[in-house]
């Protein structure tokens, strides 16, 4: 990210984030709402992580991935919300270019790992339902760790690629971002150099990072649905659909908001719709995930309850 002298000779070394609302009277309301959402998200995800760690009944591949997903949700919301709350308190909207790039990198890192981890969870459900006899060998602890490590490696490469590509652009004014965090679409519109290569890179990498995992998830659940429909027990079908339904809900929200956000780079002006999608990506998704998984999962509910009441599992 190359700061350059603008028309008046000043050097662009920072960006101005306008935030969600410009009305001063509504800033305290925004602060309270986002602080509440942040605390609920952190507590909910850490509760699931703690339950997975201490409850023997949850020491399975599915909950191993769920625990990792909880860590990612905490990381994702922590990249954007605390800095926004800090700006609301200090009433300072300026963000240095370096801090903007750092936020961009970590946001895409956590979102990228999330993308691959959701695919690993779909693969786990496919093996558990469609290949139950070989499930324990195909989804061993070594395989689980390899899937998580590969997710982090791919996401790190993706985040670093976009960050380095963004650092090559020139910014010579204006420097006002009509958003509450730094991301690719907003920065593209402020660049005074061509962003065609960056946008092409975003679409190409996005196809690999999002298109391939999405296709694998769809294929996995087509096989899962076919296998579940062959189950004679009504209770068995209900349990299988309940487990898969939670995951599919999270996948739909995650990919739906992501596609809307990054596939609209041709728009000439960012609107409040982009802010709403940004809230979904950074706040709503991490907050809903523990609610979705625990609400429809009696094992997680009972594990969290036993952990809170100090009771031990009989398993």
Swiss-Prot record:
Q: Can you tell me where the transmembrane regions are? A: 29-52, 61-82, 104-123, 144-161, 200-223, 241-264, 276-295
UniProt record similarity statement: Belongs to the G-protein coupled receptor 1 family.
Give the membrane topology, semicolon-separated if more than one.
Answer: Multi-pass membrane protein
> What's one GO BP annotation on this UniProt entry?
signal transduction
The protein's recorded glycosylation sites are 8
Q: This protein is called what?
A: Olfactory receptor 3A1
Regions of this protein lying in the Extracellular compartment:
1-28, 83-103, 162-199, 265-275
Question: Which residue intervals are topologically Cytoplasmic?
Answer: 53-60, 124-143, 224-240, 296-315
Protein's organism: Homo sapiens
Q: Which InterPro entries match?
A: GPCR_Rhodpsn, GPCR_Rhodpsn_7TM, Olfact_rcpt
| Subcellular localization | Cell membrane
Q: Which domain of life is it from?
A: Eukaryota
Protein role: Odorant receptor.
Q: Which Cys-Cys disulfides exist here?
A: 100-192
């Amino acid at each position: 990210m190359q700061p350059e002298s603008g028309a008046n000779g000043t050097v662009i070394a920072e960006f101005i984030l306008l935030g969600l609302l410009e009305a001063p009277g509504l800033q305290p309301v925004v602060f309270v709402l986002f602080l509440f959402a942040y605390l609920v998200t952190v507590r909910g995800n850490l509760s699931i992580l703690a339950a997975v760690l201490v409850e023997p009944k949850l020491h399975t591949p599915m909950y191993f991935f769920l625990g990792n997903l909880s860590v990612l949700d905490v990381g994702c919301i922590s990249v954007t919300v605390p800095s926004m709350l800090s700006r609301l308190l200090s009433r300072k909207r300026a963000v240095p270019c370096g801090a903007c790039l750092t936020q961009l990198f970590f946001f895409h890192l956590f979102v990228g790992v999330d993308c691959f981890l959701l695919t690993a969870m779909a693969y786990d459900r496919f093996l558990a339902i469609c290949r139950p006899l070989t499930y324990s060998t195909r989804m061993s602890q070594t395989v689980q760790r390899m899937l998580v490590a590969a997710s982090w490696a791919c996401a790190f490469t993706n985040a670093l690629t976009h960050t380095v590509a963004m650092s090559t652009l020139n910014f010579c004014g204006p420097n006002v971002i009509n958003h509450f965090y730094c991301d690719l679409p907003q920065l593209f519109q402020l660049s005074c150099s061509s962003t065609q290569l960056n946008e092409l890179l975003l679409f190409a990498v996005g196809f690999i990072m999002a298109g391939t995992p999405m296709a694998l998830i769809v294929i996995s659940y087509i096989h899962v649905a076919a296998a579940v429909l062959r189950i004679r027990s009504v209770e068995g079908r209900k349990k299988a659909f309940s487990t898969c339904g939670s995951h599919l809900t999270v996948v739909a929200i995650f990919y739906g908001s992501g596609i809307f956000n990054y596939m609209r780079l041709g728009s000439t002006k960012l609107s409040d719709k982009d802010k709403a999608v940004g809230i979904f990506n950074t706040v709503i998704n991490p907050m809903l995930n523990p609610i979705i998984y625990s609400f429809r999962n009696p094992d997680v509910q009972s594990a969290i309850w036993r952990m809170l009441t100090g009771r031990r599992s009989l398993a």
